[in-house]
A protein has these predicted regions:
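Major-groove DNA-recognition helix of helix-turn-helix-type DNA-binding domains
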Residues: 16-40
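C-terminal alpha-helical "lid/dimerization" subdomain adjacent to the S-adenosyl-L-methionine
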Residues: 78-81, 201-258
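Conserved class I S-adenosyl-L-methionine
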Residues: 60-100, 114-115, 138, 145, ...
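A short, Lys/Arg-enriched interface patch at domain edges and termini
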Residues: 45-65
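Class I SAM-dependent methyltransferase SAM/SAH-binding core
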Residues: 106, 112-160
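A short glycine-rich, Lys/Arg-flanked "PGG" loop and its adjoining helix->strand segment in the class I
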Residues: 184-199
Length: 261
């Protein structure tokens, strides 16, 4: 079992029990799991960590759990998130001059619209995507207050956005992939969504050991190895991948990765 994302049968094999026994365990214990449609999926790393620590709560990857968390923190998300990276990511993206007035941009895991609102004046339109209705409500409220009229919202799972292939000129995932069970799936979806010649823009933490941050912000991943992420982008089909570092308030390290389709 070398692969990271496991089926029910593979997870049961990892535990060394029958599928029937594993289903019973799944019902009675807080086994880290995620339900996609009718199918259960399990992170191998999360299962091993859960087994060794005995604490599954911080590894809970259920879609409902994540949605509930972000719905709850939506009104204070701006204050909470800015305490970690302030305006540095938005300012860096503007400084990099990668957007233009002809672009339609999709912002995945947009939250309260930190990036969507920040780049709105630079592009034709932003489609802001998030699973949390409360986050999108905050975005619309703040956009209206600022007189922003070219940001549309879409409440859906970012791994399976209901849009046609090659729909947008650029797709962003700002401080979002560390919330995902399988970032590679998300990167492949980004490749599907963006037009040939378009760009994907990701910002995220480098690998860190700040468990307090992980638990407070409901993170799944404690940052990423930049070279590993570059491999994921290349495997999805992206090319011309470039990385720049950004300063953050906690000195963990944030990178911005830009890739061409």
């Amino acid at each position: 079992l070398d692969k990271e994302i496991l089926t029910m049968e593979e997870a049961a094999e990892l535990f060394g029990v029958s599928v029937k026994t594993f289903i019973k365990l799944l019902k009675e214990e807080k086994v880290p799991a995620r339900k996609i449609g009718r199918e259960w999926r399990f992170s191998r790393k999360a299962l091993i960590d859960w087994l060794s620590s005995g604490d599954s709560q911080s590894y809970s990857l259920s879609e409902v759990d994540a949605k509930d968390f972000f719905d709850e923190v939506a009104p204070k998300w701006e204050e909470l998130s800015r305490s970690y990276y302030g305006e540095s990511i938005k300012n860096k993206l503007i400084e990099m001059n990668i957007f233009n007035k002809d672009m339609i941009v999709m912002d995945l895991g947009c939250g309260d619209g930190y990036i969507a609102r920040g780049i709105s004046k630079l592009v034709k339109k932003v489609i802001a995507v998030d699973i949390s209705g409360e986050m999108l409500k905050e975005l619309r409220k703040k956009a209206e207050k600022s007189g922003i009229t070219n940001v549309e919202t879409l409440q859906t799972q970012a791994e399976d956005v209901p849009v046609e292939d090659s729909s947008v000129d650029a797709v962003c995932a700002n401080m979002f992939l560390h919330h995902m069970e399988d970032p590679e799936v998300q990167i492949r979806e980004m490749y599907r969504i963006v037009k040939p010649g378009g760009i994907a823009v990701v910002s995220d933490y480098v690998e860190h050991s700040d468990r307090e941050l992980k638990e407070k912000m409901h993170d799944v991943w404690m940052g990423f190895n930049k070279n590993e992420m570059k491999k994921w982008f290349m495997a999805a089909g992206f090319k011309g991948i470039k990385t720049q570092m950004v300063q953050d308030a906690r000195n963990i390290g944030i990178f911005i990765m830009i890739a061409n389709k």
